[in-house]
Structure formats: structure tokens, C-alpha cells
Amino acid sequence: MILTELHLHHFRNYQDLTVHFNPGVNVLIGHNAQGKTNMLEAIYVLSLTKSHRTSNDHELINWQEKSALISGTVEKSIGKIPLELQFSSKGKKAKVNHLEQARLSQYVGQLNAILFAPEDLSLVKGSPALRRHFMDREFSQMSSKYLYNAGQYRTLLRQKNKYLKQLKYRQQTDRVLLGVLSDQLAAFGAEVIIARQHFLKHLEGWAADLHQEISLNKESLRLEYVNQLKVSDDTTVEEAYQALFKLYQDNEQREIEQGTTIYGPHRDDIRFLVNDKNVQAFGSQGQQRTTALSVKLAEIDLMKEQTGEYPLLLLDDVLSELDTIRQTHLLTAIQNKVQTFLTTTSLSDVARQLINEPTIFEIEHGTLNKEEVK
């Protein structure tokens, strides 16, 4: 898929802007605090309906205004599709083909995007919460069913945790409702767990090949899905549900005493193994970065495999965090394959040599100057 056009109205430091993009590489270049990352953020928000930088949508609206609009045209195999997102104090509205969507979940998946920012290099060595967020963010774009099940699980988890605290402090005494919540939570949790197992298995296949190539055949990469049920590729949703619900039943008193849900996919993790060694605990920084790069690049192929369309790739000042070898592999892998948006204060010599006919946008104080480079 290709984002051919983007329009911003009162978004961040952009008052009113329309820009047409190159189907290949688009370089957003400029000094810090000029609007490069804001532009990338707008594309990300148009894709996922939420920002990767803030959970407060009000921050997306220009401080002098009461509402903001992001719209664009995405070109897919089925044709061109207009997309629109409106933000105001009343909430968000999403439109596809000029038709307002009843729920935001119906909108997600129209424009798929993979973000690669410096913080993503911490995917390997960062917290389990970071890796769970990674799974939810990427897999939700590939499957509306996953998006729904993960959303239902989060809602029920909040409800159950609230009720557990009420039981802990004797504000409630009815355990029947707790059993109902646990049953529903186990049902949606099982769906999430089995879907994660499926997606990670496919992601591992793509990432392993890329890692071997980047490491010059010196290293092999494996991804292990760490979960309390110890599911395998053969585990069914029903089996996962029965196992998770039994954990809730067997540990009901313990959960009440702690006032929180102890088991479920909200406790899951991913383990990265390089040459059968846990790279999170024992790998060098270079191995950790190569692993993160392999996984992010593998997402591109996995999303194409699952949806039939290549996603957009958003590179937010990530080249400066990579050495020459990893820059080369990244830029070579995406060449003539996926529409790319790259922010930087200056292009490295490696990037200038490897990027084929980019469109460079010089950004200053929320304005763009476009220059074709042949």
C-alpha cells in the first residue's frame, strides 16, 4: 500500500498542509523541533488512530485550536481509499471512503504502518511490557479478530482487578460475579494467547533468515513465546481456555489477597535466543541491536503475508542509532519494496548512496520545501 497524499489541519505545529508523497523513500530532514517527528506521528495516527508519543489526544491539537484533522489517500491493490480522522474534546471520528465508522476498531487495518524509532532498539533488552505492547500494536493491524479480543481482554481485566480489590477490602462479598469475570477473561485471554503463538511463529521464520544474513551466517535467531500456559503450536483455543480458567479457579483466594489478576496474557513475554543463548541477559549490545533490527524488518514481510499488502515503514531518526553495517542492511532490505518515511537531521553518506531516487522534504517551523533528488 502507498500513502499518496496527506492533509493536516491544526495538527501539532501544522496549521494547514497538504503534501504528496513518493511511493519509494521520503526523507524528512531538518533541525530538531521543526516538525519532522510530528509529520511521522500524523501518518502513524492515521494508521492506528492513536499516537506512539502520547496517550492524550488533546496534545495532538494545535494549542490555539479546539479540533484537528488528519486525512489522506491510501492506494491499495483494490484501488484508492480516502481516510480521515477528526480529533476534538468530544473524541475521535474516523471515516473510510467518506463514511463514518461506528467503531475505531472498524477503521484500524485500512492503512498499516510499522514504526522503527530509537526506543525500538530496546525491544530486546527492555521490559516485558514493551514487548507485550509490540505484539498488540503489530498483530492488531494484521487481524481485526485479534484487535477485538485484545480489547475485550483489557476491559475485562480492569473490571476483574477492580472487583478483586473490592473483595480484598471487604467492599464486596459475592464471589459468584468473580467467577463469571474469570470465565469471560479466560475465554478472551485464550484467543489472545493462541493468536500470539501463531503470529510469533511466523515472525520467527522471517526474522531468523534476516538475522542470519545480517550476522553473515554467524548467528541463528529464535523467538520463544513466554506464557504461563506453556502453549505449543498444537494447543487449541479451547485447551488454552480450560487451562487458564483452571488457574483462575485454583488461585482465586490468592488473587483476592493480592487484589490483582495473577495469570493471563498481560503477564506474557518474548524471549530472544541467539545461538541458543538468551540475548536479553547475555548478548552484547551489537547482538541485541541486530536482533531488534531483524525483528522490525521481519514485520514488513509478515504483514504482507497476513494482509496481502506491504505496510508503510516509518523510520524516526533511527539511522543515527545504527552503525554502517546495520544501516546498509536496513536500507538495502527496504529498497524498491516498501514506501518509507525517514526523519533525520542529516543524511549519512551510506544513506545517500543506498537510497534510490528519494524525495527530500526540508522541514522548518511546520513548513515543507520539497526537492527531487535524482
Swiss-Prot record:
Keywords: ATP-binding, Cytoplasm, DNA damage, DNA repair, DNA replication, DNA-binding, Nucleotide-binding, SOS response. GO terms for cellular component: cytoplasm. GO terms for biological process: DNA replication; DNA synthesis involved in DNA repair; double-strand break repair; SOS response. Pfam families: SMC_N (PF02463). ATP binds at G30, H31, N32, A33, Q34, G35, K36, T37. InterPro entries: DNA-binding_RecF (IPR001238), DNA-binding_RecF_CS (IPR018078), P-loop_NTPase (IPR027417), RecF/RecN/SMC_N (IPR003395), RecF_2 (IPR042174). SUPFAM superfamilies: P-loop containing nucleoside triphosphate hydrolases. The keyword Nucleotide-binding applies. It is found in: Cytoplasm. GO terms for molecular function: ATP binding; single-stranded DNA binding. It comes from the Bacteria. The RecF protein is involved in DNA metabolism; it is required for DNA replication and normal SOS inducibility. RecF binds preferentially to single-stranded, linear DNA. It also seems to bind ATP. Belongs to the RecF family. This is DNA replication and repair protein RecF. It comes from Limosilactobacillus reuteri (strain DSM 20016). The gene is recF.
